[in-house]
Amino acid sequence: MKGYVVCVYKGISSEEKLKEYAIKARSAVEKYKGKFLIRGGKTTTNEGSKSPRTVVIEFPSYDDANSFYNSREYKEAHKILMSHAERHHQTIEGS
């Protein structure tokens, strides 16, 4: 079954750091054969709090998605954004 990384941002304090993070994270996504399904875009908040950004990445498997998140490459990218964004981050197994 496919694996998905879902990231719902609650707040972003630096668009510049977000761009820097995105460039570095992209190479880790590609290394683990991830495919971006959603990166920002137009949204309608139907329930709950409005989010400034949502990202969904599909991986060949749940294990690949977890390997991506726990990889050295992604951890380096994550450090760039840590104090510049608040977000909810999950790895989900598809059906």
Where are the language model's segments positioned?
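Short S/T/G/P-rich N-terminal loop/turn motif that feeds into the first structured element of a domain
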Residues: 1-53, 60-66, 70, 93-95
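C-terminal structural segments of small proteins and small subunits
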Residues: 62-90
